[in-house]
A protein has these predicted regions:
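Conserved glycine-rich helix-kink/hinge and helix-boundary motifs of the Major Facilitator Superfamily
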Residues: 47-48, 214-215, 274
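Juxtamembrane transmembrane-helix boundary motif
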Residues: 1-12, 67-182, 204, 234-295
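Juxtamembrane transmembrane-helix termini in multi-pass membrane transport proteins
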Residues: 26-79
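Transmembrane alpha-helical segments of multi-pass membrane transport proteins and ion-pumping complexes
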Residues: 13, 17-25, 29, 57-62, ...
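Membrane-embedded alpha-helical segments in integral membrane proteins
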Residues: 27-41, 96, 105, 127, ...
Length: 295
């Protein structure tokens, strides 16, 4: 890597690292667009590096949880089969796009079909994230409400399994598998750990308390991250030097983010997070506009 490339990678890692430090969620939704648009990294490589970079962060969080005595993570293991299947589906789709040379013609402009499709998918995901943030702002969840019922509690789709995370209440295994499948596709195909969507889904749909939902998501993200990184590395989608520089910047960014977070109220945190999503959306739109207007 050139000096400019190294500085760019560290800067991107720094920016993305601030996000978990401030908001407590991964920055995969921002890392892939930044690597692709600003650093010119192909999307498959950006996704693979994102998986490897996030694994380091998740591992640190897992060690902290184990030290704190968190053990009731059966739900994470139930999510894992669906997540693993979704992961392989997402990576298979990514591999197909990597080798595709199909073109798309819009208003007389010839665009790379796969890159355009991927960017549009990222744009759609940003809109979903914006909706999630809006719902979080409207419906505040009481973290101490251990008996909160989820929207899917009344769905009697067998088999159902009683879990400690739900204080003995049962959960539908097929529905848990579907959630894992969706999160796995996001991880394998787009480099997103799924925490942004999995935590609200566990809280609102399955009635898991916020604290336990974060613990479950952290554990499942660790399991998924190991498999995702190995699978991407096997397919040549991981640039190890790039990952190292991203980790360096991310470590510095996380420290800075933690210092910033203690100075912001919950309302301001949500407002700033909405701005981060807006910025990510703007980056994607800028790249799409560049493709439309021509190289």
């Amino acid at each position: 890597m050139t000096l400019v490339g190294i500085l760019t990678a560290v800067a991107i890692g720094l920016v993305v690292g601030v996000i978990p430090g401030i908001f407590g969620v991964g920055g995969g939704f921002l890392l892939v667009p930044l690597l692709h648009v600003l650093a010119g990294v192909p999307i498959p490589i950006a996704v693979g590096c994102c998986s490897a970079q996030s694994l380091g962060t998740v591992t640190t969080g897992m060690l902290h949880r184990r030290a704190a005595g968190e053990r009731s993570l059966r739900l994470a293991w139930l999510l894992f089969p669906g997540t693993l299947l979704g992961l392989e589906l997402g990576i298979a789709l990514l591999e197909w796009t990597k080798h595709s040379t199909a073109l798309l013609t819009i208003a007389g402009r010839t665009l790379p079909l796969m890159e355009t499709t991927q960017l549009v998918c990222y744009l759609a995901i940003m809109l979903v994230l914006a909706a999630v943030v809006g719902l979080e702002a409207i419906y505040n969840v009481d973290e101490h409400d251990a008996h909160r019922r989820g929207a899917l509690d009344s769905v009697a789709l067998p088999p159902r399994i009683a879990l400690p995370e739900l204080d003995g209440r049962s959960v539908s295994l097929p529905l848990v598998t579907l959630l894992g499948l969706f999160v796995g596709i996001l991880n394998g195909g787009f480099g997103m750990g799924g925490a942004l969507l999995q935590v609200p889904a566990l809280v609102y749909l399955f009635g898991v308390s916020t604290h336990r939902a974060v613990a479950v998501t952290l554990a499942s993200s660790f399991l998924t991250g190991v498999c995702s990184t190995a699978s991407h590395a096997y397919r040549g989608n991981v640039d190890l030097p790039l990952v190292c520089w991203l980790l360096l910047g991310g470590t510095l960014g996380a420290q800075a983010g933690s210092l910033i977070a203690v100075r912001l109220s919950g309302r301001k945190l949500r407002r700033w997070f909405a701005l981060v999503i807006l910025a990510s959306t703007g980056i994607i739109l800028a790249r799409l506009g560049h493709l439309m207007l021509g190289e």
